[in-house]
């Protein structure tokens, strides 16, 4: 087996502070220009986002370097990972457990160093760093017939430690149950063990002139970013109930990201707000609210419905970070609000990933599935979807969720990602 630290004379190492800054400056050419100057891009990354609880406690920059010159500023490629707790429910186990995942982002090779295989070397070595087995894993569908025991993935009881930590000293890598990324280059990452999963979304147009959103119930609460922490706690309780639901499949390991303090949602909103203040005229109206909480008819917190969103001022869209509804009426109220917000602030569309179609009575036929796979926008469920069209994303610049699995499993068990929504994107 190839060494975890070396591959044909190259190593992947945690970046020094100087390497991290150079990597950020390099990325500004690809992801900052022409809207942001290099200084603005660095400010976004280092001052605005780099000081958030999401970045400070979870982020790691990696760089691919020659094995004999690990601190060089002329490194070959770079990427980032974020350490993310997850909740895991296994067949045959009564209790939900906690484990670790890593999200991968900012995979970048400078133009002058491309077409040399550096990205492939880096992603291979990154898998070696994250996986307890120190290897590139099989794809999800190829693992279904396998039995894995003693994987070395860190797993703790639900009540062990507080929600954000594992009492492991913050060990980074070599302890993951899974990792995931959002591919902008189709299924390129499948050769390194990341399988595209859950790449469908519902898309709506903003409300047009004369259209009004559904009336909100008494007690509906609009949420500012700092108020999302409480919603994160509510959402965690709902996700725990969803994982523990005995009516679900007994042949699937089910997991979701565990973020009860809403660090990811708040990070994404802070990122989008930077664009609002940087790109829009000072006199232009800026959004104040990024979530809506609808109380249940019984007043029970567990039965509430809610949506969290951000404004993408580059693509001019409202991205729904989290959408939870307990009825078709609540769905209509939440979607109407999001579409109204899009209209108010000049957005061109709204998107929500992996909406719970079954709860709305939407059942896809084989013909529907085939049409989606061929790139057809499915519009025949507009009544149930409140004017929305169902879309399957493919190709470049489409942020395709892709998952790699490292942990223990029994033969025949599938892996099911619960709540695979926009709110975990990075």
Please annotate each region the language model reported.
Residues 162-165, 172, 182, 186-217, ...:
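Active-site/acyl-donor-binding loops of N-acyltransferases
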Residues 131-174, 285-302, 370-394:
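Intrinsically disordered, low-complexity domain-flanking/linker segments in eukaryotic proteins
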Residues 26-94, 243-298:
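Active-site rim helix/loop that mediates acceptor-substrate recognition in acyltransferases
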Residues 64, 81, 109, 309-311:
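GNAT/GCN5-related N-acetyltransferase fold signature
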Residues 106-109, 114-141, 328-343:
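Conserved acetyl-CoA-binding loop-helix of GNAT-fold acetyltransferases
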Residues 195-321:
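Amide-forming acyltransferase catalytic core, primarily the GNAT-like/NAT-type
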Residues 120-254:
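Contiguous mid-protein beta-loop-alpha structural module that forms a pocket-lining wall or clamp
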Residues 87-103, 311-320:
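A conserved beta-turn-beta hairpin within the catalytic core of GNAT-like acetyltransferases
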């Amino acid at each position: 087996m190839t060494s975890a630290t070396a591959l044909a004379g190259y190593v992947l190492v945690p970046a020094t502070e100087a390497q991290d800054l150079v990597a950020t400056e390099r990325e500004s050419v690809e992801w900052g220009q022409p809207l942001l100057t290099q200084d603005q891009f660095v400010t976004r990354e280092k001052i605005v986002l780099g000081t958030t609880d999401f970045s400070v406690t979870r982020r790691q920059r990696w760089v691919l370097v020659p094995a004999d010159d690990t601190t060089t500023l002329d490194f070959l490629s770079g990427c980032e990972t974020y350490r993310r707790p997850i909740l895991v429910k296994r067949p045959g186990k009564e209790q939900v457990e906690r484990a670790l995942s890593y999200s991968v982002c900012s995979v970048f090779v400078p133009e002058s160093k491309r077409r040399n295989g550096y990205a492939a070397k880096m992603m291979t070595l990154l898998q070696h760093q994250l996986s307890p087995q120190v290897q590139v894993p099989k794809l999800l569908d190829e693992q279904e017939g396998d039995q894995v025991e003693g994987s070395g993935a860190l797993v703790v009881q639900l009540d062990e430690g507080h929600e954000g930590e594992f009492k492991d000293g913050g060990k980074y890598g070599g302890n993951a149950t899974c990792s995931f990324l959002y591919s902008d280059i189709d299924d390129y990452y499948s050769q390194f063990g990341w399988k595209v999963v859950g790449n469908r979304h519902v898309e709506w147009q903003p409300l047009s002139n004369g259209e009004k959103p559904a009336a909100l119930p008494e007690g509906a609460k609009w949420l500012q970013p700092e108020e999302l922490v409480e919603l994160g706690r509510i959402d965690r309780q709902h996700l725990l109930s969803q994982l523990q639901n005995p009516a679900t499949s007994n042949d699937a390991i089910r997991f979701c990201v565990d973020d009860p303090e809403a660090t990811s949602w708040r990070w994404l909103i802070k990122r989008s707000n930077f664009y609002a203040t940087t790109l829009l005229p000072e006199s232009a109206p800026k959004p104040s609210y990024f979530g809506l909480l609808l109380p249940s008819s019984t007043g029970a917190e567990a039965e509430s419905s809610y949506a969290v969103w951000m404004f993408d001022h580059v693509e001019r869209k409202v991205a729904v970070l989290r959408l939870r509804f307990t009825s078709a009426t609540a769905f209509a109220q939440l979607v109407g609000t999001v579409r109204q917000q899009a209209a108010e602030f000049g957005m061109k569309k709204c998107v929500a990933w992996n909406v719970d179609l079954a709860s709305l009575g939407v059942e896809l036929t084989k013909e529907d599935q085939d049409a989606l796979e061929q790139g057809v926008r499915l519009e025949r469920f507009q009544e149930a979807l409140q004017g929305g069209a169902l879309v399957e994303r493919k190709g470049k610049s489409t942020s395709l969720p892709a998952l790699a699995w490292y942990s223990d499993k029994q033969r025949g068990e599938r892996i099911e990602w619960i709540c695979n929504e926009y709110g975990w994107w990075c």
